[in-house]
């Protein structure tokens, strides 16, 4: 019989998650994630500390393109035009997670973790992060008059990471946590 391997999350990442949770609680915000190449590692890291249910709402693992479309509402045409690993798809994933989970902050991850699957334009280690949020005015004062949907902001960021598959995925989670903390603390550019 084989002994199961235990997955351990570093103390550094746990400290980042606790800082993220504190910042989200202070704003009364909840978080959702939408992950492709990390396969739920960010959501798993976020839910490691006790009390994460106060601020973590949902994690969508949308590894396949049809999952991105079916669960997050990413248009097939967008994926066909730009590819799953693109700024446009990362943005649509983050916006879809924000809307479908009814949260104030969402982060998406799509990329090429390797060892195969890369191209000249999108080599192994290419990762796009998408960040979407509801503007603070709407979260403090409720929905705009007339029942309109709250205004959202979003941005994307391309990462080019080195290492094997595990290293690329781990680096992505660490960077994603940094970006989430900055946004939740109001330090990120909107």
Task: Label the model's feature ranges.
Residues 1-190:
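Short alpha-helical segments enriched in small residues
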């Amino acid at each position: 019989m084989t002994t199961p391997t235990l997955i351990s999350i570093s103390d550094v990442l746990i400290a980042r998650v606790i800082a993220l949770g504190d910042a989200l609680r202070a704003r009364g915000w909840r978080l959702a994630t939408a992950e492709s190449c990390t396969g739920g590692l960010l959501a798993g890291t976020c839910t490691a500390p006790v009390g994460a249910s106060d601020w973590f709402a949902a994690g969508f693992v949308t590894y396949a393109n049809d999952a991105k479309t079916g669960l997050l509402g990413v248009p097939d045409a967008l994926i066909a035009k730009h590819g799953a690993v693109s700024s446009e798809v990362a943005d649509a994933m983050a916006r879809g997670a924000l809307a479908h989970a009814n949260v104030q902050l969402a982060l998406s991850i799509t990329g090429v973790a390797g060892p195969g699957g890369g191209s000249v334009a999108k080599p192994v280690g290419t990762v796009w992060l998408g960040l979407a949020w509801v503007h603070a005015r709407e979260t403090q004062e409720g929905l705009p008059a007339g029942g309109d949907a709250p205004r959202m902001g979003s941005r994307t960021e391309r990462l080019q990471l080195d290492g094997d598959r595990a290293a690329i995925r781990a680096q992505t989670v660490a960077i994603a946590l940094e970006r989430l903390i900055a946004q939740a603390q109001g330090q990120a550019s909107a």
